[in-house]
Amino acid sequence: MSITRHLARHALERPEAPALTCGGETLTYAALDALVARCATRFAAAPAGGIGLDLPNGAALAVLFLAAARAGREAQILDPGWPEGQRRQVLERVTPGLLVSAQAGDIRLDAGQGVAGLAEAIGAGPAEARAEPDPDLPFYVGFTSGSTGLPKGYRRAHRSWTASFDADTAEFGIGCGDVILAPGALSHSLFLYALARGIDAGAHVLLSPSFRPRIAAELACAHGATVLYGVPTQIALLLDHLAAEGETLPGLRLVLCSGAKWPPGRRQMLAHRMPNAAFAEFYGASELSFVTVAKEAEKVPAGSVGRAFAGVRLSIRDAAGRRLPAGRTGRVFVASPFLFMDYATGYSPDLYVSGDEVSVGDMGFLDDAGFLHLVGRSRRMIVTSGKNLFPEEVERVLETHPAIAAAAVLGVADGKRGERLVAFLSLAEGEAPARADLIGFLKSRLPLFKVPRVYAQVADWPLTPTGKTDFPAIARLWPDRCELLP
């Protein structure tokens, strides 16, 4: 069964039910199924290789992704924000059989192309009946940041997501009565997953051409959103907008957060502005999909990313691959039916394999109750004064300080210590903490060798397209484009 396994059934049973809304356009299930079928017929006849989709965020991209999946072809979803040189390098590696682009490609679409006239724009004729694709065929290549600077293309088979759909039904109970708001870019796997998950369930999926808190709030109100997918920065901006307007979203029953740890100081505002929503955050990776889930009702220990997601088995291993007991820190390995197939852009040094278990280099430990605690990424580890330090631990503590909105701790070359710690900070509005105060704050919570002595304020906090802190961009600000705290 493919990720579009239930689309035709929903179209038959509930033809007039809304399936997809984006940018002022809404498709019913009958209309979506018919359009996907026509576009799938076009893609099935394309030259061998993947279907490259280099398009702005929107309904056209969503439909063409589903069409490639139904055709048994691999949708390679590029980020339209990439520089031209990076785009060219990625295309040279993934070599699509057909490229659909708003720039240059085999099929060129206008940047504003919607669903009206989409089939004609790609040269699709009438739909032809076709068998369901093999569940072990690849359907998707997404891209995530690579240690070399070139995005890594990871490949997934249908089965990895259909198994996820079934597992998260058990976790979250998403069904045909839900209205799913996924206001981020489809080049980010979280929001692409939300789209596919919603269509599989027969829900109404709300997308946005770009993330704007006001537009997200308006979509939620106008269509009665019940489920919100987001990364912490987006959810926080949405909450700030609701607070500024004196509004709430009482119709939301579930907020699903991923990409980074949700700040504890924001929980009260979330409960006030989304008063009927259960909050759950999950840890995962592009290669791993769901790994753990942390639900408010399950009394997750402070600092933990939760318990294993349904269908997932966790282990902690040392550098030699030996399994470690509870409480011991090592590399986090995951076994599940949700794992990716391989890298479409070649070998990655960040991937570790032990039997049927895979690790992307995250370090952590399991407590006696089976909750996972992440320490950091092995590739971000800093050696200072001969000791290994994971900067994520320091960042998490700094972000509990009321004056700090975001923190990034990096190592700067130091002839005596190996690397000197520098804490880069985005300060909360109107706040101006002194360096000595921050040192004292950290010394009461961390060992002395983990306490930075240098603090730099960053006026315009760099973010990746997916809303995460852009650490390489922050490193480039040192020392001339940041302001040292006195």
Regions found by a protein language model. Give the residues of each.
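Conserved ATP/PPi-binding loop(s) of AMP-dependent carboxylate-activating enzymes
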Residues: 307-311, 322-352, 387-389
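Conserved AMP-binding A3 loop
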Residues: 28-30, 139-163
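Gly/Ser/Thr-rich phosphate-binding loop
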Residues: 227-229, 241-301, 313
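Conserved pre-ATP/AMP-binding loop-to-beta segment of ANL
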Residues: 3, 15, 125-143, 150, ...
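Conserved AMP-binding/adenylation subdomain of ANL enzymes
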Residues: 162-179, 187-227
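AMP-binding/adenylate-forming catalytic domain of the ANL superfamily
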Residues: 447-468
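AMP-binding/adenylate-forming catalytic core of the ANL superfamily
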Residues: 228, 336, 356, 363-450
